[in-house]
Amino acid sequence: MKKIVILGGGYGGVLTAKKLAKKFKNNKEVEIKLIDRNPYHTLLTELHEVAANRAPEDSIKIDLKKIFAGLKVDVVLDEISNIDFKGKKLQSEKATYAYDYLVIGTGSKPTFFGIPGAEENTLSFWSYDDAVALKRQTRDMFTLAAKEKNAAVRRSMLTFVVVGAGFTGVELIGEMAEYREDLCKEFYIDPSEVRLIVADMAPKILPILPDKLIQKAESYLRKMNVEIVTNAKITEVGKGSVALGEKNVVDTHTVVWTAGVEGSEIVGTLDVQQQGRKRIVTNEHLESVDHKNVYVVGDNIFFIPEGETRPVPQMVENAEQAAPVIAANITADINGTPKKAYKPGFHGTMVSIGSRYGVANVGLPGKFFMLTGFMAMLSKHFINMFYLSQVVGFNKVWTYMMHEFFHVENRKSFVGGYFSKRSPNFWLVPLRMLLGGMWVYEGVDKLKKIWEDPDKIFLIPAAPNATDAASAASQAVDAVKETVDAQSAASAVTTAKEAVEALPVPGFIYDTTNWFMDLMFYNPDGTYTFLAKWFQLGMVCAEIVFGIMLIVGLFSAIASIATIGMAVMIWSTKMASTEMLWYVAAAIACIGGSGSVFGLDYYVLPWLKKHWKKIPLVRRWYLYTD
């Protein structure tokens, strides 16, 4: 039995475990174990949204048991204190874990560069708990400031300093600038009293980006009334102040530290070669240069690719690209096949500044292009959803879309509040029942005609090569009359041609429809095939069934979408009048939960959702919503 242990449930650890589980899903001789001290995976790149109350607290946590449901990965909650490389064991206070192959992905922690008071008097910003603590600290300061009579104390309470103007610091200060507006309204504080500062020892913010994007970011931050302090010689952080230089001491109750990271605490204690703030040196296969059965993933990697002068960056894409290489190389070790070399090709960086603006430098290696505003935010959201699709599939992508686009408050989205305006579903009840009633009426009326003459085809137009033109025209008129209200159709058109052309159809769609009907419904002599009769009966029954579903509010979303599909089918044959537009518009309005009020969906969907999530295949493929 080969034992693979992955230490750390961060980006790299989770993706490596999933890749290994896929490779060894049918191999009973391989055991995969992931160890982390938390029961959840944290989306570190979204911490700023929780800290500034834009996203729910649980939106950046993903249950590890959910991620690995149905997969060959044993999740263990424990905190490892030592690794015995010679004995191939991981040790904690309560257990010992043996391994044949080890993947170290314990991530990073803040580094304070020996600055006096920095560690003791600042809020770190590198975990879920940090984000929640900062949100509470910010609210507490506004709560106290609203009651404070001393102007100097009030001013210090309403001064917030973020040390570090890299990606994390800039994204955080941008979110806090938007959060300021909300809190000022809530606590009746003039926004001009609130001071936001982002400071860095470097000569410019976001130094990894091109100067043009840096200027755009600075301009937007200043527009948000954020003070930018560069070349800040941070010498000390006191209990109520921070020194941003010899003559620039800022009184504040809140200093957030985002100025840099180093390897996690356990990495610093390991007997392995390290460089660059406690990063483990690896070879091209991402193995520790000291231990060939030990691999390194994510922020812990120190590896300089061929032709480069700098080590791979500590960013999510590095973890994403390293994970499949490590999984492939462990597989190669076990199977005795050649290993893969790590050849990363990064696709750029994206920075959001608040919920509505961002800058990005993205593309392919050697061919990058700059984005700002809407397009930069679109690219960032796309990359986030792509990552989530790898980790928890549809489930988390759906949740992400809800809190980023559809359930936002105060228009905090790059698409504004256009997709998040909500109204009570009970206003849709009359429309839903009317729409259902119309479809039932149409279906029952047509069913009577089928009952009278089962062989008469009136829902499918006559073949173009039918010999009796007059009969064809008559059938076309009958078809239109059966599709829409007969009296309205008669008053709206005078000939079959006019009726059929009531709603125009693009030529390529009409030609495709004709090709399909020639294949399925017409004989060479222009008469109908036996399928035509059954298709007609099926359409009529569908109109009745979906109409009833709408009336009683059962699976109203499915019924609404189905009626839209039927309307499109009718339209594609040039047999739909303008009345069909009403059917489609009403169905679109009824998709969004119209059956949850005075409908069976109110009872059925919660029960179905509860039992649906219990199906192993559903959980394995994340085909459910929370």
Feature annotation, model-predicted:
Residues 403-541, 558-559, 571-579, 591-626:
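Alpha-helical membrane-anchoring segments
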Residues 559-570, 583-587:
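Central hydrophobic cores of alpha-helical transmembrane segments
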Residues 1-74, 160, 170-208, 256:
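Beta1-alpha1 glycine-rich phosphate/pyrophosphate-binding loop at the start
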Residues 1-3, 73-161, 256:
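FAD-binding core/adjacent interface of flavoenzyme oxidoreductases
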